[in-house]
Amino acid sequence: TAACAVIISQGASIQFVKLTTSLIYLIRPILLQIYVDRNYQIDKKIEYKEEPIKQKWNGVAQHVAAVVLDGTDTIVLTVFSSLSNVSIYSVYHLVIYGVKQLFTSMTNGIQSLMGELWARQELDELRDFFGWVEWSIHTGAVLVFSCTGALVVSFIGIYTNCVTDANYIQPLFAVLLVLANAVHCLRMPYNLMILAGGHYKQTQNNYIVAAIMNITVSIVLVKAAGLIGVAIGTLVAMLYQTVWMANY
């Protein structure tokens, strides 16, 4: 972020900015490789007798379902609606997704600490820590997304000023999309605990059902309600997943 800010302030082209970002991201795996080679003796020729990662395909299934869940709206709008709706959705998604990513980036490292406490079976400490994480994430999500919901339409109005290809002022759609992403963040403490505990197999059906639910509701409603339809589909899927995870 700092490098991009400096380069942009110097008037560099977008191509150079993206090249700089790519090179910075490339440095991390190289440094990790150097660190691992220096500090760990890994026998790459060893043969194992049983599957070392027992739930890896369950994890893959979860990840695929999560990708489908996140990408459903754009695909449904592209196939069943107009390109102007795709454009409107993309602008709102750019802003709201950025807010969500900024919020979720603050939780980096929490999962590993939960996993360590779970592995050591320090359950009292885990309960206390989880309670703090749950309160912090829920309070932060309510605060951040309340501000987002109040400001996003005005921001989009300024951002798309003089753009006449579509009507970008969509208050109801904005509220629904903000709610869907807020609910997605509300489920984070439960999702972090599930992943920290390694319960991939036990919870993969939840991800699959949520993805199917999002696709089905979005396709059914998109013809009649357009952007509102896909936003409702996403919100319904997120609500289902959050309630299920909290109960689990």
What are the residue ranges of the model-derived segments?
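Helix-loop junctions and terminal segments of transmembrane helices
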Residues: 96-134, 190-196
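Hydrophobic alpha-helical transmembrane segments
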Residues: 1-37, 55, 209-213, 224-248
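Interfacial/gating helices of multi-pass transporter permease domains
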Residues: 14, 51-55, 59, 77-97, ...
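Helix-terminus/linker motif at the lipid-water interface of multi-pass membrane proteins
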Residues: 10, 67-98, 116-117, 153-165
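Alpha-helical transmembrane segments of multi-pass membrane transport and lipid-handling proteins
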Residues: 6, 130-185, 215-224
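Alpha-helical transmembrane segments of polytopic membrane transporters and translocases
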Residues: 20, 57-58, 73-74, 87-106, ...
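Membrane-interface junctions at transmembrane-helix termini in multi-pass inner-membrane proteins
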Residues: 1, 12-15, 36, 40, ...
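Interhelical loop/hinge segments that connect adjacent transmembrane helices in multipass membrane
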Residues: 11-21, 27-71, 75, 109, ...
